[in-house]
């Protein structure tokens, strides 16, 4: 085991390709231990603080179960029930909370909130989701693809839907892990140029037609049309995205061995056909489970370094 200095995981680009190679292999090992009921407690007596401003099922369950399986325990903090929800400065909260726990996961709205928190934290901070990025989910998706098909390097990932936190995280992953990213969304929901790095021109291709975006893709993925915090736009988004539902016809344009993923929860008949998400090319349940294993690998790495 080689200890590391304090390192945060706030967006996908925070780790190098070499670190991802280690993490993904470590996730494979930890998943095997889990399946074999093998006890592994490198985080014995360590405490994870989980701070939620946005509610979640999968994020809370995967982090809470994950730290427990590694020998530690979790403390759940909802901002509505803490001083953070009563106007305590983020910087002050970071100083206090990070003196009482060993690692912190935050699921919130603006990326600047978690960036400010991490700047004043004495322990590692993990982005459980922000409006801008969702690195833990893309890490799980990448692991799922590798588990099913081998390396993701040189492959094509097609994103059909909103320019949201998942799309921007996939762009960062394309650079780190050497694959191509296809993006398609209706007018008015395109990528924000300020969120797309200069190097992206060599990795990212934007398509007006979602069928064209799926052509030859090895992975087709999507998300809900209306993310949390945008509920007032729901009706307008349903109208705008009606031709961006992932269909069997789109999957038929993809590579013969293409997979379908969705970070869930899904709305069948909106962003994806039931025949696709419930069909043989879908790996959404493996994808959901793998949040648990990649996050265990991540917490182990941030606290213990490499084994």
Curated annotation (Swiss-Prot):
Pfam families: OTCace, OTCace_N
Reactions accelerated catalytically: carbamoyl phosphate + L-ornithine = L-citrulline + phosphate + H(+)
Alphabetical UniProt keywords: Amino-acid biosynthesis, Arginine biosynthesis, Cytoplasm, Transferase
PROSITE patterns hit by this protein: CARBAMOYLTRANSFERASE (PS00097)
Residues that, per the record, bind carbamoyl phosphate: 56-59, 83, 107, 134-137, 263-264, 291
GO molecular function per UniProt: amino acid binding; ornithine carbamoyltransferase activity
Known EC number: 2.1.3.3
Subcellular location(s) per record: Cytoplasm
GO biological process: arginine biosynthetic process via ornithine; citrulline biosynthetic process; L-arginine biosynthetic process
Claim: Glycoprotein is one of the keywords in the record: no
Predominant localisation class: cytoplasm
Gene3D superfamilies per record: Aspartate/ornithine carbamoyltransferase (3.40.50.1370)
Function: Reversibly catalyzes the transfer of the carbamoyl group from carbamoyl phosphate (CP) to the N(epsilon) atom of ornithine (ORN) to produce L-citrulline.
Protein name: Ornithine carbamoyltransferase
Organism: Cupriavidus metallidurans (strain ATCC 43123 / DSM 2839 / NBRC 102507 / CH34)
Designated gene of the protein: argF
